[in-house]
Amino acid sequence: ALARKATIYAEVLGGNTNSGGQRGEGTMTAPNSVAVQKCIRAALENAAIKPSEIDVINGHLTATSKDSLEILNWTKALGLSGTSFPYINSLKSMVGHCLTASGSVESVATVLQIKDGFIFPNLNCEDLHPEIADLVDSSKIPIKLIHKDIKVAIKASFGFGDVNACVIFKKFKI
């Protein structure tokens, strides 16, 4: 890309994929928490970054009853909560669930946040689920656009079939 003088939107630092095997609480449509947390931790290890370096998470978050479980899994995997937790959002609040295209579409949105220095809001997030409010400060779940320099962002998909993926992007600097 440098040799071609192409625009570099972000650097892929690392990532991980795994499956919960539809065991324990994992089902065809619900993730296995142990596998989700392992996926997040392995992605961080693969990218050689610490949880405190994450500026924003573009979560799987589908506005369902499992959102609080996803947030709980993030807090456990990262060891962060309250105001130390990174910002978290979900593109699904703007475009709906793109099904098999979700990971790709949401990765583009994540990279654009890095490139253009903003955190997109969680639209229609009027009443924060009490279980989420107990884990993460409400300021970390933006309901309005935030202009902010983003250095590191994670995109997560904890999808159908109990299959998990996390990819970590970083702002590219020459």
List each language-model region with its residue ranges.
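Conserved small-residue
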Residues: 12, 54, 58-60, 107, ...
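Active-site-proximal gating segment of KS-fold condensing enzymes and close homologs
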Residues: 66-81
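Stable alpha-helical structural segments in soluble proteins, enriched in small hydrophobic residues
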Residues: 39-47, 73, 77, 110-113
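Acyl-CoA/ACP chain-elongation machinery
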Residues: 15-31, 59-68, 84-136
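Short acidic capping loops at alpha-helix termini that bridge into adjacent secondary structure
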Residues: 50-53, 83-85
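Conserved active-site and cofactor/substrate-binding residues in soluble primary-metabolism enzymes
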Residues: 7, 31-39, 49-52, 65, ...
